[in-house]
């Protein structure tokens, strides 16, 4: 059975539009930089290649999972959606997929902003770049007077220089 937003709402005992924040990280390993080899300005891993998964009934493209997340989000209608994915989504041919994601946010009624953040700038002893999407339902942005620039301003400034594992564990 396909999971619906209504299934989740029923399980939580709430109605569409009552969820404040929906946070998700749908896998998009086809766009991951892990193991990618750069040749002639392009990446040989991931971009344009289809990875598949099977739930025992059908086989689907793994990159379609982001749109499944957005399908469920449309049904739940949270005030804010936060989503995280690999930074490779913002590079080369994958950028078309990124645009498809942002267009889908807009089609389902959300104002969206995104930024690549590196965890090492936020006190994590690891360099891990991720694109973060913050989407606010249009009626909420109108009610509180948010604009695209206000949403973009939600992203935090980097607050630390990169730290090592030794730095992180030195006082334990």
Which role does the model predict for each range below?
Residues 1-6:
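SAM cofactor-binding core of SAM-dependent methyltransferases
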Residues 7-19, 29-172:
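Class I S-adenosyl-L-methionine
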Residues 22-23:
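Hydrophobic beta-strand segment of the Class I
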């Amino acid at each position: 059975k396909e999971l619906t937003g209504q299934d989740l709402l029923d399980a939580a005992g709430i109605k569409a539009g009552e969820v404040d924040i929906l946070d998700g990280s749908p896998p998009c390993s086809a766009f991951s930089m892990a193991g990618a080899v750069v040749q002639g300005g392009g990446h040989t891993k991931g971009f344009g290649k289809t990875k598949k998964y099977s739930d025992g009934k059908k086989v689907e493209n793994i990159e379609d999972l982001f749109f499944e997340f957005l399908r469920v989000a449309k049904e739940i209608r949270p005030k804010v959606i936060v989503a995280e994915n690999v930074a490779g989504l913002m590079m080369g041919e994958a950028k078309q997929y990124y645009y498809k994601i942002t267009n889908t946010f807009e089609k389902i009624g959300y104002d969206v902003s995104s930024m690549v953040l590196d965890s090492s700038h936020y006190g994590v002893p690891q360099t891990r770049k991720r694109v973060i999407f913050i989407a606010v339902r249009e009626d909420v942005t109108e009610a509180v007077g948010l604009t695209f620039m206000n949403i973009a301003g939600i992203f935090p400034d980097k607050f630390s220089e990169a730290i090592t594992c030794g730095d992180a564990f030195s006082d334990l």
